[in-house]
Curated annotation (Swiss-Prot):
Name the record gives this protein: Small ribosomal subunit protein uS9
Ranges for region Disordered: 128-147
Domain of life (superkingdom): Bacteria
GO biological process terms, semicolon-separated: translation
Cited PROSITE patterns: RIBOSOMAL_S9 (PS00360)
Recorded GO MF terms: RNA binding; structural constituent of ribosome
Organism whose genome encodes this protein: Aquifex aeolicus (strain VF5)
InterPro entries: Ribosomal_Su5_D2-typ_SF (IPR020568), Ribosomal_uS9 (IPR000754), Ribosomal_uS9_bac/plastid (IPR023035), Ribosomal_uS9_CS (IPR020574), Ribsml_uS5_D2-typ_fold_subgr (IPR014721)
GO cellular component, one term: cytosolic small ribosomal subunit
Family: Belongs to the universal ribosomal protein uS9 family.
Keyword Phosphoprotein among record annotations: no
NCBIfam families named in the record: PRK00132.1 (NF001099)
Keywords: Ribonucleoprotein, Ribosomal protein
Length: 147
């Protein structure tokens, strides 16, 4: 049963908010203290809301999103509501993962060393390289002919 964000009473006492980014994907993540095991992803593009497993479809991406909970031992203690836009499904999953890690840090700042050691607080800054003029792409060149 999928619930809408408006169905949750979002107050500073029962939610933790953070933003995660990866490539072109941006995820706004709310951790819901009162609703454990509720995982909803809302796509800004389609204005639909999905169950997390239904949205990411691949088990590896689902495990990647849940990794911050596993590392800190907070499995089953929070629900996730996230809205994502931009990028592909893999980048969106990593953006949600990064947002979850930052939101857990808001919940308990003592988790910082654990999350840092797992590499969850370092944003992956790799972006697509821009196309250069006079070339086919970022690195690919047009075929050169001497005559």
């Amino acid at each position: 049963m999928i619930q809408k964000l408006k169905d949750f009473k979002l107050t500073p006492e029962n939610t933790y908010y953070a933003t995660g980014k990866r490539k072109e994907a941006v995820a706004r993540v709310w951790l819901l203290r009162d609703r454990p095991n509720t995982f909803i992803v809302g796509s800004d593009k389609t204005n639909k809301e999905y169950d997390l497993r239904e949205y990411v479809q691949r088990e590896t991406l689902y495990n990647k999103i849940m990794y911050p909970f596993k590392v800190t031992g907070h499995e089953g203690k929070f629900g996730i509501y996230a809205t994502v836009r931009g990028g592909g499904i893999s980048a969106q999953a990593e953006a949600i993962m990064y947002g979850v890690a930052k939101a857990l840090l808001q919940h308990n700042p003592d988790l910082r060393p654990t999350l840092k050691k797992a590499g969850l607080l370092t944003r992956d800054a790799r972006e697509k390289e821009r196309k250069k003029y006079g070339q086919m792409g970022a690195r690919a060149k047009y075929r050169w002919s001497k005559r």
